[in-house]
């Protein structure tokens, strides 16, 4: 009976597979949004202000960061929880695949969230004259929360690797 339960629990990891497929679809939608932004800006480029162009570029950077986060979560999550990816040639295999444990994924996700929050904050600050002081204050507080959380997670991870647990 115990072996049956263990096999069922072990096999249940495949329930995460549709989640990773969903993230792949989300990545496709994000890619479409990226190109939509580029197509939107091309005809208006000569009439745009410098700050308007910077805002568009920040949006593209934001989409890129979120896309990178999605790829990292999809690949490492699949490899950690479902099955190892068997890429035949070393040239095609990403260097970090198969090397990230759950803690390193958490730290990379946290630092990616901080980077994404930084881009959002910068976009907000570039339009500061149109934004209320309360919105700016909340943006800064939320960003600081992300920074402190990421720093705390990194410290805890470092301490656990040194044996302070």
UniProtKB/Swiss-Prot annotation:
Membrane topology, from the record: Multi-pass membrane protein
A single Gene Ontology CC term: plasma membrane
Spans traversing the lipid bilayer: 10-32, 53-75, 134-156
Major localisation: membrane
Lineage top rank: taxon: Bacteria
Subcellular location: Cell membrane
UniProt keyword terms in alphabetical order: Cell membrane, Membrane, Plasmid, Transmembrane, Transmembrane helix
Family recorded in the similarity comment: Belongs to the UPF0114 family.
Protein name according to UniProt: UPF0114 protein in repA1-repA2 intergenic region
